[in-house]
Amino acid sequence: QNRLGQLQLGSASLIFGRVDLDNDVRFYIGRLAVSDERQEPVVVDWRAPVAEPFYRATGRDPMGLIRRRHFVSRGRELLEIEDELFDLDQLDEGFQGHGALLAALDQNRDGQLRDIVATIQGEQDEIIRDPLKGMLIVQGGPGTGKTVVALHRAAYLLYTHRFPLEGQGVLVVGPNRLFLRYI
């Protein structure tokens, strides 16, 4: 509880998802990792390997998931819970909603780059988690998420390859100052 008070999340919520694995293990997915006093994970960082199925699991390849749960909240207030079930035996135990991605797309734009970490799609996650090797080119039309995917890739690489990249920094290049303020 003391550590939670020290986190500077602003209006962002700590947890946005949960994965229930087929071995009765659950992981809460959030913007950063939080452990209890015994150093047991309470929340796993979205960049951690165990969080990958939250973004990539499909009906064809559930990646060991029984359920993927999305939380919609504002600060510490929980507004909505939605389940995606991968095990039909769990069908009566879920919360059905109109889709975390659709809800995010329905929000008004305010001139600021949106925090997409809760709604990253499988194809975007493949780019974000692509192994660290040479150059990676991402192409797409305007508004398709290239910039946010690139920024999340930088965050992922700095998390995953902290020691080899430590002290090297990240350079973000943009076409003008307005764009750089936007991101």
Where would I find each of the regions flagged by the language model?
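N-terminal accessory nucleic-acid engagement/regulatory domains that precede
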Residues: 1-103
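P-loop NTPase Walker
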Residues: 103-183
